[in-house]
Amino acid sequence: MQKEKDVAIVGSGLVGSLLAIFLRKQGHKVTVFDRRPDVRNVQFSGRSINLAMSNRGWKALREAGIEDEIRELALPLDKRAMHVEGQSVYFQKYGEEGEAIYSISRGILNRKMIDLAESAGATFRFEEKIWDVDMKEARLYTGESEKSVWKEYQFDLIFGADGAFSRVRHKMQRQSRFNYSQHFIDVGYKELTILANEDGSHKMDNSSFHIWPRGNFMLIAMPNLDGTFTCTLFMPFDGETSFESIKTEDEADIFFEKYFPDIKDEISNLKKDFFKNPTSAMVTIKCFPWSYFDKITLVGDSAHAIVPFYGQGMNAGFEDISVLNEKMNLYGDDWEKVFEDYQTERKPNADAIAELSYRNFVEMSKKTADPKFLLRKKIEQKFAENHPDLWTPLYSRVTFSDKAYSDALKIGDYQREIMDEVMKIPGIEEKWESSEVEEKIISLIKK
């Protein structure tokens, strides 16, 4: 147990709420600030992709002692359901028997996490906007507007958990030698909903992550506990087939009839929601350093926002908190050492999952309908089943383990080189299950 500190967390999202629980367990006084209203009292905005909880997230929740409460909110998905044009729906298992990702609503999870943090003794101050941060003195200044009278709060430590456009990080960026970059992809997303059947059951398989790959764009759907599915359309902002090109309800109707005829009539209020729900942007943010001496550090998206295509944004943020807690246990009251070790360990892993997430976007939208790519995955899966000591697929290494993201990226690149060679074998389409292919992979691994 550390000596009690008066701690501020800026941001009451998932990562901020989890951090509040860990800090309370360490015996600290915790105040959480958020410029937004209490999410428990507002309707959801139609701007949130469903979350995929995997091993890293569950590990952090287990360490916080709240895993069981959160599992009650989640649905296990053990496979992808691929809705490829001109083909029957087919399924791709994610990993070994019993391995699954878990679909969970961001809004429902956030409400629960705030409840749990409050139960642990954290104080939440909603609709209180941070306008300035005195980094040397660990002071926060809040107010109605930039020109209104500000209120001053004094703390021992401040954690920035306020997302991709963090106010805390914005202040840190004014330091000399603070590195920062942001990159928006030219693809946006829009959320839609498939309602439950009248008896409350799901209209599609509810143990699958559904994907409609269409080249430059795609639709995904994840089930919710209430029988609904949250659908997310990912598509370029501009161009021939884009959000910008669909201007009327009739054009939206024609678009869905052409590309998603099997699901079009199931999407609730399709034409209305397409224009009512916002089209949101996606950004990758990198920065360093994440901490300022023994006073301030960044966690989650405020340190490393990523695109959502590996389902690892929340998991990476939760892993930040797990590692931070590990450093608190290791170094006790030496907060400068806690922060330094935390950022040194997490930075290369954050960069790695950012890269992997972007690559997975290309894979999900463009490659999952490609027969060569699917054959490659089948060969890899079969070899992994026969030789688990020699091969763990990249997806499993990221999703079903808690080994470093940076190692997953490195090993994944090595495996890709091997599979490139394997796919050059003459007649690979006919002999993919043969001992020749298996022996070729083993020989390449042992090179």
Curated annotation (Swiss-Prot):
The reaction(s) this protein catalyses: L-kynurenine + NADPH + O2 + H(+) = 3-hydroxy-L-kynurenine + NADP(+) + H2O
Similarity-based family: Belongs to the aromatic-ring hydroxylase family. KMO subfamily.
Coiled coil: none
Cofactors required: FAD
InterPro entries: FAD-bd, FAD/NAD-bd_sf, Kynurenine_monooxygenase
PANTHER family xrefs: KYNURENINE 3-MONOOXYGENASE
GO molecular function: FAD binding; kynurenine 3-monooxygenase activity
EC identifiers of the protein: 1.14.13.9
Function: Catalyzes the hydroxylation of L-kynurenine (L-Kyn) to form 3-hydroxy-L-kynurenine (L-3OHKyn). Required for synthesis of quinolinic acid.
Keywords per UniProt: FAD, Flavoprotein, Monooxygenase, NADP, Oxidoreductase, Pyridine nucleotide biosynthesis
Protein known as: Kynurenine 3-monooxygenase
Signal peptide: none
Gene Ontology biological process: anthranilate metabolic process; kynurenine metabolic process; L-tryptophan catabolic process; NAD biosynthetic process; quinolinate biosynthetic process
Pfam families on file: FAD_binding_3
HAMAP family found in the cross-reference section: Kynurenine_monooxygenase (MF_01971)
Top enzyme category: oxidoreductase
Gene expressing this chain: kmo
Pathway membership: Cofactor biosynthesis; NAD(+) biosynthesis; quinolinate from L-kynurenine: step 1/3
